[in-house]
Amino acid sequence: MPHVAVVGAGAFGGWIALHLLEGGAHVTLLDAWGPGNSRASSGGETRIMRATYGPDQPYTRLAARALRLWSKYERRWKRQFLHRTGVLWMVSSRDDSLERESLTRLGEAGIAFQKLSPGPMKKRWPQINFADVRWGILEPECGYLDARASCQAVVAALVAGGGSYRQVAVSADGLENAPFRGLTLSDGSRLKADYYVFACGAWLGKLFPETVGDLIRPTKQDIFFFGPPAGDSRFTDTHLPVWGDHGKRFLYGIPGSGRRGFKVADDTRGPAFEPTSGERVVTQATLKRVREYLAFRFPAMKDAPLIETRVCQYEQTADSHFVVDRHPQMDNVWLVGGGSGHGFKHGPALGEIVAELILRDGEPDRVWCLSRFPEARS
């Protein structure tokens, strides 16, 4: 079986490496700062698990497969990563086509859902102001994932199963030159393999400036955690689902989990961000906007103190679809990335797909190919 070097131990790279190992490959996984580190797109404590995506996309079925795989590995490792609080989509936008067209896709994929009118929502979650909400979707089997912990667990399982993990950086020198002659590492060594997978998130364009470059653009995303009133459990994951609010903007949140506070963020793509050296400090403008929203949608949280902030990045493509493709000049080099703010949940399923593509010499889904970009190098 082949030796595969995987660069990046996040939600994509870690799961790709583990599935390759389970498929019989010899695997070496590399990461510059370690799984779940604070610079990574997969860092932080939590990520949302949802399947509502609209029409004409592969992600609802991918999420359905991911749900099954998360459950499978939870049982195998005897650890919980998916917290099935439910996910509530609140539709306040005049254009509700995404949500309406999602209902058919959810049913086809076997995802449980409920279509809700304002009355039942108000009765079930009185802590939410549904004043302008027209209707909603509840995905009861979805919720949130433990992000950092699951990335670390995947790498631990890889090593326990006989795979190799090294915390080293990969030099960009020579990566675009065919034929591919291996990796130069930050410890001065070189690594040669039969196949190479680069699943290095916001750094993919830096390592492959000619092939990827600005096709994947890191954006700065501010995250806020607010403290609910003392003794008030209405804003914890025992009394409130994960939620998304589709209005003029799209905001989302995760109820206080692990006692870290009430997580709120604006999904609007932020400014360009340098993931290695960028200062991870939130802006007052974003905080003001989120506070105004919080006061309206969750009135009891109007004066809640800000108890924690975080800056992560999206690795954004122009169409928000992933990149899964061979390097156009080197058949044994795979490029995987472009999570675009919604990739984490899909890690187990995407890893399974990519591992099969490599081991069976398959062809990737055209929606993820580099050729979809007019400016892509051929």
Give each language-model segment a name.
Residues 72, 93-162, 166-167, 172-179, ...:
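Flavin (FAD/FMN) cofactor-binding and adjacent substrate-gating region
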Residues 18-23, 80-84, 195-198, 202-332:
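Active-site substrate-recognition segment that forms the wall
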Residues 6-7, 190-203, 351:
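Short hydrophobic core segments
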Residues 46-124:
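Dinucleotide-binding Rossmann-like beta1-alpha1 core, especially the glycine-rich loop
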Residues 2-29:
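N-terminal Rossmann-like FAD-binding beta1-loop-alpha1 element of flavoenzymes
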Residues 22-42:
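Glycine-rich FAD pyrophosphate-binding loop
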Residues 293-378:
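C-terminal catalytic lobe of FAD-dependent flavoproteins
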Residues 12, 35, 203:
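Conserved Rossmann-like nucleotide-cofactor binding loop
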